[in-house]
């Protein structure tokens, strides 16, 4: 009976759009890609998607530091991320962004359904506020001591030591991560998702087999502690989606981030005519939905996400596949040691297949951390891929090419041995299917040892010197190449670049189902080097370059600050001499004879000043400035100009021309007030 192809949708966690992809990120994307490639080899219909997580205060603040719009920053970051994933041959069908119309519509739809179904609650909360920056502080911008385990230097929403979640107000001795100031408590109305209403459903789902045992056990601890309502809104200023019918309130990034899976798939469906969004996301969908994620975001994916889907009438994930962290040389990745390696830096020095293989050899279905030991990395890749697999082809291909014009023998030299190799496919397939790629690699390398032992025993280099044994030589070498073909078929999900070169050499596609039929009387192409041995010097150069990346990141910041550095330090007495006041622009008009100046009539609350300001290009319709409050230097000596006397200076930011921005105070300021 022919097995019916499965419909599968696979996602990876969305990389945050405020930084580069590093080798820690790549573990997840490689793991998922290996699993996806295996499923595709077995004939299943797999759609593999991802997107950038592009909202939140960190992105807003970083864009401000760079002097660019958040949209500009996330667009550049998306391009870099996609280039890195392509360099590692991650076979995404679609890569999108949470800052998209698809995601805006779906976020609004899900929120609307949750609200209509009674799962959204409104209440006024006390929230930490940075008095220096004039903004409410989101969870990740408050740091302090965990209220559960008392670990220091933890974020305001969850503890990286014990995994607990809490509100920022529970944090002990909080500090603003933006300014370092001690936050103040202020009140604000927020919207909450009623997570406790889904407790029974979530507990049943937890034990349904949808989660690894380690994850299910951790979730039970959260259930025992009691689920809390989840704050899903943030106050302006915030870069994200404004909540419908709630001006100044924005969806918290963790609400629209997982919806980004749906948004990316919707974008793919709109591009193609053969995909139906509802077939994969409707309540009774028969498609499989798998999320590959790291253990640091289990809470959001195992509680909030399935509850949101359930409450809004969509299907829940079939399974969450959770992995551990990456360490390098037994320690946390370090910029100072050069082990915080960006994906782009790696690709400048080494073949992507090398890291894919090393990760595959270490991965299992458990949530264990993976150590990238750089010396072991070099030794294992060279020993396994070069010495065992590729060497098997090179030892035999030369004879086939030179002595037999690239033609393989018409029968197998050892049919029983070949059957041993193809029979092993069932166990290797089961390992891949269950995400036990480490076990699959061990079984494949055991076969590689057998294949090389066969060649050693048959010694084709000796047979080649014996007159009249051409048929034996062709049979031995053809057997070696057929065994190489089976090995590379099993390695195809792991080594896509080497697979492509192998298929060119063998003159055939590597197919799992095809290996039961050996290549007999088959024409292969002239052998070319398939894989280069890793040179330890290249690894050292990569580490050194990563140290240089850190120095560059520390010393070169793009944006206004880099273009116009801070001036020499002045003392407080010098600064105190400058008297800045709030001024009301009563009249603003063009200056005849000047293409740069505007004449401003300013009210200082009892005194009127005339100021000439070079802001005409930025404000071509000066009447729009009238009635606006601004800041002026009130004690600047009057300056006689061709058009009249200027009695001060208004304050503005920007490089000049059209890019200049008049400063305005917050509401409540009055003309004449001193700016301190």
UniProtKB/Swiss-Prot annotation:
Name the positions where Zn(2+) binds: 146, 149, 159, 162
Q: Where is this motif: 'KMSKS' region?
A: 332-336
Q: Which reaction(s) does the protein catalyse, per the Swiss-Prot or TrEMBL entry?
A: tRNA(Met) + L-methionine + ATP = L-methionyl-tRNA(Met) + AMP + diphosphate
Q: Keyword check for rRNA-binding, yes or no.
A: no
Q: Which UniProt keywords apply?
A: Aminoacyl-tRNA synthetase, ATP-binding, Cytoplasm, Ligase, Metal-binding, Nucleotide-binding, Protein biosynthesis, RNA-binding, tRNA-binding, Zinc
What this protein needs as a cofactor is: Zn(2+)
Instruction: Give the residue interval(s) assigned to the motif 'HIGH' region.
Output: 15-25
The organism's superkingdom is given as Bacteria
List positions binding ATP. 335
List its EC numbers: 6.1.1.10
Which family does the record assign? Belongs to the class-I aminoacyl-tRNA synthetase family. MetG type 1 subfamily.
Looking up HAMAP family in the UniProt record yields: Met_tRNA_synth_type1 (MF_00098)
User: This protein is called what?
Assistant: Methionine--tRNA ligase
Q: Which organism is it from?
A: Pectobacterium atrosepticum (strain SCRI 1043 / ATCC BAA-672)
The taxonomic lineage of its organism, from the top, reads: Bacteria, Pseudomonadati, Pseudomonadota, Gammaproteobacteria, Enterobacterales
């Amino acid at each position: 009976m022919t097995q019916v192809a499965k419909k599968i949708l696979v996602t990876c966690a969305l990389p945050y759009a405020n930084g580069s992809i590093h080798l820690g990120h790549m573990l997840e994307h490689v793991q998922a890609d290996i699993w996806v490639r295996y499923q595709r080899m077995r004939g299943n219909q797999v759609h593999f998607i991802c997107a950038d997580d592009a909202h939140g205060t960190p992105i807003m603040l970083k864009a401000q530091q760079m002097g660019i719009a958040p949209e500009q920053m996330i667009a550049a970051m998306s391009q870099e991320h996609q280039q890195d994933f392509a360099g590692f041959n991650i076979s995404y069908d679609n890569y999108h962004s949470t800052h998209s119309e698809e995601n805006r519509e779906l976020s609004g739809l899900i929120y609307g359904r949750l609200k209509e179904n009674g799962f959204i609650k409104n209440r006024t909360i006390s929230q930490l506020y940075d008095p220096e920056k004039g903004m409410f502080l989101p969870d990740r911008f408050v740091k302090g001591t965990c209220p559960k385990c008392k670990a220091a230097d933890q974020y305001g929403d969850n503890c990286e030591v014990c995994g607990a979640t809490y509100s920022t107000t529970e944090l002990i001795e909080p500090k603003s991560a933006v300014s370092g100031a001690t936050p103040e408590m202020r009140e604000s109305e927020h919207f909450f998702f009623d997570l406790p209403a889904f407790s029974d459903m979530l507990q049943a789902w937890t034990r349904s087999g949808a989660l690894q045992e380690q994850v299910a056990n951790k979730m039970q601890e959260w259930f025992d502690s009691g689920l809390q309502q989840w704050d899903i809104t943030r106050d302006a200023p915030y870069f994200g989606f404004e909540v419908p019918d709630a001006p100044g309130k924005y969806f918290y990034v963790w609400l629209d981030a997982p919806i980004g899976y749906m948004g990316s798939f919707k974008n793919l469906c709109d591009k193609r005519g053969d995909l139906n969004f509802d077939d994969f996301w409707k309540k009774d969908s028969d498609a499989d939905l798998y999320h590959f994620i790291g253990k640091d975001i289990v809470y959001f994916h195992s509680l909030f996400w399935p509850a949101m889907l359930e409450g809004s009438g969509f299907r829940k994930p079939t399974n969450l596949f959770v992995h551990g962290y990456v360490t390098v040389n037994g320690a946390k990745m370090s910029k100072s040691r050069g082990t915080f390696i960006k994906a782009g830096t790696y690709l400048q020095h080494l073949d992507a297949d090398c890291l894919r293989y090393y990760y595959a050899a270490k991965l299992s279905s458990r949530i264990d951390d993976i150590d990238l030991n750089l010396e072991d990395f070099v030794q294992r890749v060279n020993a396994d891929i070069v010495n065992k697999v590729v060497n098997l082809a090179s030892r035999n291909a030369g004879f086939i090419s030179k002595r037999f014009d690239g033609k393989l023998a018409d029968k197998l030299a050892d049919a029983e041995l070949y059957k041993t190799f193809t029979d092993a496919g069932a166990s290797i397939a089961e390992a891949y299917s269950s995400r036990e790629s480490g076990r699959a690699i061990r079984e494949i390398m055991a076969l590689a040892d057998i294949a090389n032992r066969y060649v050693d025993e048959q010694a084709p280099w000796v047979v080649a010197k014996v007159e009249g044994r051409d048929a034996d030589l062709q049979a031995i070498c053809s057997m070696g190449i057929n065994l190489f073909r089976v090995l590379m078929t099993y390695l195809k999900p792991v080594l896509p670049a080497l697979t492509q070169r192998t298929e060119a050499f063998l003159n055939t596609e590597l197919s799992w189902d095809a290996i039961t039929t050996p290549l007999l009387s088959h024409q292969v192409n002239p052998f070319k080097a398939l894989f280069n041995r890793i040179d330890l010097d290249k690894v050292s150069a990569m580490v050194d370059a990563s140290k240089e990346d850190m120095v560059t990141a520390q010393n070169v910041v793009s944006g206004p600050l880099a273009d116009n550095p801070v001036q020499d330090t002045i003392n407080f007495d010098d600064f105190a001499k400058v008297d800045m006041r709030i001024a009301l622009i009563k009249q603003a008009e063009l200056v005849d004879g000047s293409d740069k100046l505007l004449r401003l009539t300013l009210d200082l609350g009892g005194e009127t000043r005339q100021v000439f300001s070079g802001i005409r290009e930025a404000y071509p319709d000066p009447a729009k400035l009238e009635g606006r409050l601004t800041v002026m230097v009130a004690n600047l000596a009057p300056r006689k100009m061709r058009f009249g006397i200027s009695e001060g200076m208004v304050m503005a930011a920007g490089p000049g021309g059209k890019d200049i921005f008049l400063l305005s105070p917050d509401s409540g300021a009055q003309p004449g007030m001193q700016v301190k």
